[in-house]
């Protein structure tokens, strides 16, 4: 029991002794009354501003609690409905209210009007099936809301409207089938929400086109493990990107990210999402996810690099800060060694090294429009000297190969079309052509004339051998008939060459006139 001792007022001496004792009793009675001192109920345990009424089979809040308490624990009771009258008194200083492990099935509007300054509300392990619009609208200062281990299957887009200071929201262990994207986009988005736990629900996929719009500082606190995801390369690229950025939501629960194929049955084996060569997803698909979240900047070792923050909210009323790959905060007008941030959002790396490569997040905060935007930029650091030498080697090899091919083609063309032909070759070609054309008109061509040149006289005479034909017809008595009634012409021509004699005279071996036997 908690008692307060106050200084009793000085009683007038004119009061009689009996009346004085009666007045003292009245003062003490007023001081220890429930409304003034807040005596601790028999079902609770009180410690100054902390009251615990756990596991007492309570269905409502005791009415004689001290009004200035800061923490009230009503877990493991039988509270089933939260309406406007479930708390009989107003707790203006109450900051933590614990209602886990009750039978709460519904929350009415105005249920928390008597606790306007709550910062932490625990409604976990109850029987809530949905969260309606403006359920928590009175809790303007609420920072942590625990709704895990319920039966929630529907969240109204305006369910958390007005909770502008909400930082952590626990929704794991429910029956949600869609990712609550309204928490990050739209009219009722929560700008300060940096922790969202929707693990172990029934969410089959993530809206990839919208999740890329979530600022980086909010992405770090999204927990998705334990959901029955459908295997997809886009989901894999998102999670592997978070894993490479060392998000605790993926690093700490790597083995709890699983998926199933469409063809799998309900009880089929789950596949690990975060594994190498997952479903043969191409590297371009994975990189596409990286690029969608920002830009890529190339820097050279030892050369000053300037990276601009391409934010749509950037103007004179915008403040910029950067977050490095190691979660180091980079701000303007601060000594950060190798880094420097200007007021226009530009990041300068004076002497980049390989260890400076990674994903940098630029956070632009517009004071006038009350907007903020996060731009993720991938900075790659490479060695210009090494890359240049490799480039020159590749160029030299390609140029040599091309030159060799051109030279080969030129030589082939020269060989085909520019081969020299001597005069003797041309003369022989002409003679062969003439002899073939005159074969049908004459049996033998005439020999060279007397005025022929010396070269022409080198050639021998042409002769014709006539093949005798046997006529087996009757009346020939086996005689050989050289020429039958119809003349048969043999066109076999034999060329012979006789060397020139010392006296420069050329004799004919055979006459030009063919010998014909008479019949």
UniProtKB/Swiss-Prot annotation:
Required for depolarization-dependent survival of cultured cerebellar granule neurons. May mediate homophilic as well as heterophilic cell-cell interaction with AMIGO1 or AMIGO3. May contribute to signal transduction through its intracellular domain. The keyword Transcription does not apply. Pfam families: ig, LRR_8. InterPro entries: AMIGO, Cys-rich_flank_reg_C, Ig-like_dom, Ig-like_dom_sf, Ig-like_fold, Ig_sub, Ig_sub2, Immunoglobulin_dom. The chain crosses the membrane at residues 398-418. Residues 419-519 are cytoplasmic. Residues 1-38 form the signal peptide. Residues 39-67 form the LRRNT domain. The keyword Hydrolase does not apply. Residues 39-397 are extracellular. LRR repeats lie at residues 68-89, 93-114, 117-138, 141-162, 165-186, 192-213. This is Amphoterin-induced protein 2. It is found in: Cell membrane; Nucleus. Highest level in cerebellum, retina, liver, and lung. Lower levels in cerebrum, kidney, small intestine, spleen and testis. PROSITE patterns: IG_LIKE, LRR. Glycans are attached at residues 57, 103, 280, 287, 344, 372, 380, 383, 387. It comes from Mus musculus (Mouse). Keywords: Cell adhesion, Cell membrane, Disulfide bond, Glycoprotein, Immunoglobulin domain, Leucine-rich repeat, Membrane, Nucleus, Repeat, Signal, Transmembrane, Transmembrane helix.
């Amino acid at each position: 029991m908690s008692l307060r001792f106050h200084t009793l007022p000085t009683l007038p001496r004119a009061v009689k002794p009996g009346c004085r004792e009666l007045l003292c009793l009245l003062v003490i009675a007023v001081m220890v009354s429930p409304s003034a001192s807040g005596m601790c109920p028999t079902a609770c345990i009180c410690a100054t501003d902390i009251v615990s009424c756990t596991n007492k089979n309570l269905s409502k809040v005791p009415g004689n609690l001290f009004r200035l308490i800061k923490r009230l624990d009503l877990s493991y009771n039988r509270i089933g409905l939260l309406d406007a009258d479930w708390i009989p008194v107003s707790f203006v200083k109450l900051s933590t209210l614990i209602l886990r492990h009750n039978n709460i099935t519904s929350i009415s509007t105005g249920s928390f009007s008597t606790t306007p300054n709550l910062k932490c509300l625990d409604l976990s392990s109850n029987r809530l099936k949905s969260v309606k619009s403006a359920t928590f609208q009175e809790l303007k200062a609420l920072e942590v809301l625990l709704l895990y281990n319920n039966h929630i299957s529907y969240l109204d887009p305006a369910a958390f409207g007005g909770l502008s200071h909400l930082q952590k929201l626990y929704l794991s262990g429910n029956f949600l089938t869609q990712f609550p994207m309204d928490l990050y986009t739209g009219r009722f988005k929560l700008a300060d929400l940096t922790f969202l736990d929707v693990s172990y629900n029934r969410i089959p996929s993530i809206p990839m086109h919208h999740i890329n719009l979530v600022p980086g500082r909010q992405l770090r606190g999204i927990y998705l493990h334990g959901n029955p995801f459908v295997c997809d390369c886009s989901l894999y690229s998102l999670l592997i990107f978070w894993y490479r950025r060392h998000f605790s939501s993926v690093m700490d629960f790597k083995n709890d990210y699983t998926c199933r194929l469409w063809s799998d049955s309900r009880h089929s084996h789950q596949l690990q999402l975060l594994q190498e060569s997952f479903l043969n997803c191409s590297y371009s698909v994975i990189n596409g996810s990286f690029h969608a979240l920002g830009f890529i900047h190339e820097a050279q070792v030892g050369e000053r690099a300037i990276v601009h923050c391409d934010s749509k909210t950037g103007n004179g009323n915008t403040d910029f800060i950067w977050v490095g790959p190691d979660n180091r905060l980079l701000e303007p007008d601060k000594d950060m060694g190798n880094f420097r941030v200007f007021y226009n959002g530009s990041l300068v790396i004076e002497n980049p090294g390989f260890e400076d490569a990674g994903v940098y997040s630029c956070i632009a905060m517009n004071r006038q429009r009350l907007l903020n935007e996060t731009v993720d930029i991938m900075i790659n650091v490479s060695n210009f000297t090494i890359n240049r030498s490799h480039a020159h080697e590749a160029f030299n090899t390609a140029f040599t190969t091309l030159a060799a091919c051109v030279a080969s083609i030129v030589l082939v063309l020269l060989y085909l079309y520019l081969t020299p032909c001597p005069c003797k070759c041309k003369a022989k070609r002409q003679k062969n052509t003439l002899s073939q054309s005159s074969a049908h008109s004459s049996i033998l061509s005439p020999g060279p004339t007397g005025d022929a040149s010396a070269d022409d006289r080198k050639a021998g005479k042409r002769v014709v051998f006539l093949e005798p034909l046997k006529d087996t017809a009757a009346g020939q008595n086996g005689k050989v008939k050289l020429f039958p009634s119809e003349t048969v012409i043999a066109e076999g021509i034999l060329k012979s060459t006789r060397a020139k004699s010392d006296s420069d005279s050329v004799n004919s071996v055979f006459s030009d006139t063919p010998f014909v036997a008479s019949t």
